[in-house]
């Protein structure tokens, strides 16, 4: 069975840039039609490890995004590295996954109700995709710095700015393998400081942030040698 039926490349970004000590090849796979996925037909395409993980989700959306993200990774490994047999996952101290037997291949997965995303790179990488919706100001004030809150409150579409900032923070933390932590206000500092250059104040030179053309979701991706500031 051809798994590409279930994991179509809807958006591809490819670039080579001097980011580690050598040029780094990067590929982003994004599927924003996860509602079209036939989960039951796709389950046999998963490794036993991932299938059991998917089946632990009781809700359809969780199971669907788990399956879709895995299929994107599988497709990317086949097309970019010629890997036909899916490697086993190992997990770091904070739960960041890695591919057993392929230390030179770095990847990261993310999903929301609108889309799933997978990024592959020769360097450590972090990606986060989030749906754009009404934001909770109380949550924003707890997770955003004073400057970030100012940008949100001044924006014509504050929910989009909040989502951009949130995905940036998550991508940086996923790059380092930390995951979410108590203090999120100081994530975008140092080398990830906002607006030091680039397209505007809600941008970071080392982080690529993209809003879907239809405005349903935003994703951010960051590459580095280890995620330190």
Predicted regions span which residues?
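Core catalytic alpha/beta fold that binds nucleotide/phospho-ligands
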Residues: 5-229
